[in-house]
A protein has these predicted regions:
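Conserved NB-ARC/NACHT P-loop NTPase core of NLR-like innate immune receptors
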Residues: 1-248
Length: 248
């Protein structure tokens, strides 16, 4: 029922990165990236560069590093490559459903159905409050705790705001877990890009209120409309970055 995307399959198509290659010095030898990578407190970073910078390779590498560091811990690693969703109009649904699936898969078996129910209850409540035309029967879950067929299409086509709110409700129950979030290629979103990125910005601001440690990495090309929406976020932009002492 959920429109999740195979992120690991997509990552497997991205060429592996040579961290020591000079073309990536602007990131890996940058003081802002070093602070983000090694931070003991919450950090947000936006990487911005043209296509030839091969930023998806960097994102793929960081996802792998974060997942390896999270082994045998409660640390939660969530990631989404927008380029995997270029053929669909429902990127907000793809995004929230994919991250929900990652949360479920990283949780104990006895908690998984509770997480899914939490997401669905929050989503249905949000839609019900917005769509007053829904009948009482349409708002009721069946005996298995899953939506009736009559509301499944509503869930799959829910507005972005309600989808993000439902995802936040799930993460609110995971408050004590440290969290890494990597969202790559926001410029690749072709349908309702501004609306989606605006929701991502609000999502980032929500996560920054968490008491546990968070690391958030966002990437895109340096497009003017994205710059406007991400104004104020810490950023490394290609050829405009601050350089550490190890970079000439």
């Amino acid at each position: 029922m959920l429109s999740k995307l195979d992120q690991n399959g997509h990552i497997s198509t991205i060429p592996r990165l040579d961290r020591d290659h000079p073309m990536f010095y602007w990131i890996f030898k940058n003081m802002d990236f070093t602070q983000w990578s090694s931070a003991k407190c919450s950090r947000v970073l936006w990487l911005s560069g043209p296509l030839e910078c091969n930023i998806p390779q960097v994102s793929s590498y960081i996802v792998s590093q974060e997942k390896n560091a999270a082994l045998n811990t409660e640390h939660l690693v969530l990631y989404f490559f927008c380029s995997a969703a270029t053929k669909t109009r429902s990127v907000a649904a793809n995004f929230t459903h994919t991250l929900l699936n990652q949360i479920v898969c990283s949780s104990p078996m006895d908690k998984r159905i509770l997480i899914i129910r939490r997401f669905l209850y929050s989503l249905i409540e949000g839609i019900s409050n917005k769509e007053t035309s829904l009948s009482r029967e349409e708002r009721v879950l069946n005996e298995k705790g899953l939506p009736d067929i009559s509301i499944q299409s509503i869930i799959l086509n829910a507005p972005p705001k309600e989808l993000f709110t439902a995802l936040e409700a799930v993460l609110g129950d995971e408050e004590q877990r440290c969290l890494s979030v990597i969202i790559d290629g926001l410029d690749k979103v072709s349908y309702q890009q501004s609306e989606f990125i605006r929701e991502v910005r609000a999502f980032v601001e929500y996560l920054q209120q968490r008491t546990s440690k968070i690391k958030i990495l966002l990437t895109s090309r340096p497009l003017a409309e994205i710059k406007d929406l991400f104004d104020g976020l810490p950023c490394i932009e290609h050829d405009r970055e601050r350089k550490g002492p190890s970079v000439s």
